[in-house]
Design a protein with these regions (language model features):
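DNA polymerase processivity clamps
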Residues: 1-103, 116-191
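Specificity-determining recognition surfaces
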Residues: 109-110
Length: 191
């Protein structure tokens, strides 16, 4: 697999790996070998990310978090060779080789949990990030929640705290379908 492709997949999914969860199978990155390529997925029980090929699953493994972070550091350019055995995985990129044991467990059925997008709003990514950051300044320090109201060509972002301080931001959007939902702002910013 091209190094840039694997590194990109790790960057798009690695943030969702659990750190020290008692459900040990969440403390890593699930890598599936599929008929048309590979797919990566990760979840910490609150958020989930996956990307890659969509063909039939031929093999599925869970690589520990520390090994994934080390792999992403060693991958630079060229091609990456991934060798999988029953108990471990070896990743080779140029002169660098990393070997680790696999996590023995069953990764959650992420495809069943995935939300199909029936509500869509298209906006400028940086404007949304900036609006989320500004609105979250006055959010509850413990929960850091923001409310998004999507409608009529705009995304309204609001937050508040126990002292009745409130913040509101509006981001222009297109192709909006109405939706009102509350989110932990950190999860939105990570995505």
């Amino acid at each position: 697999i091209p190094a840039e492709e694997l590194r990109g997949m790790i960057e798009r999914t690695g943030f969702a790996m659990a750190v020290a969860d008692v459900r040990f199978y969440l403390n890593g990155l699930m890598l599936e070998v599929r008929a048309d390529g590979i797919r990566c997925a990760a979840t910490d029980g609150h958020r989930m990310a996956y990307c890659g090929a969509s063909g039939d699953v031929l093999r599925s493994i869970i690589i520990p978090r520390k090994a994934v972070l080390e792999m992403s550091r060693m991958i630079d350019s060229g091609d990456v060779q991934i060798s999988i055995s029953d108990r471990g995985v070896r990743v080779t990129c140029g002169a660098s080789v990393a070997t680790c044991r696999l996590i023995d467990g069953r990764f959650p059925n992420y495809e069943q949990m995935a939300v199909r997008p029936d509500t869509i709003a298209i906006c400028n990514r940086q404007e949304l990030i900036d609006g989320l950051r500004r609105a979250s300044v006055l959010s509850n320090e413990k929960y850091r929640g923001v409310k998004l109201e999507i409608s009529h060509g705009a995304i309204a972002i609001t937050s508040g705290n126990a002292e009745n301080d409130a913040s509101s931001e509006v981001v222009d959007a297109t192709q909006c379908t109405d939706l009102t939902a509350a989110w932990k702002v950190d999860y939105l910013l990570d995505a």
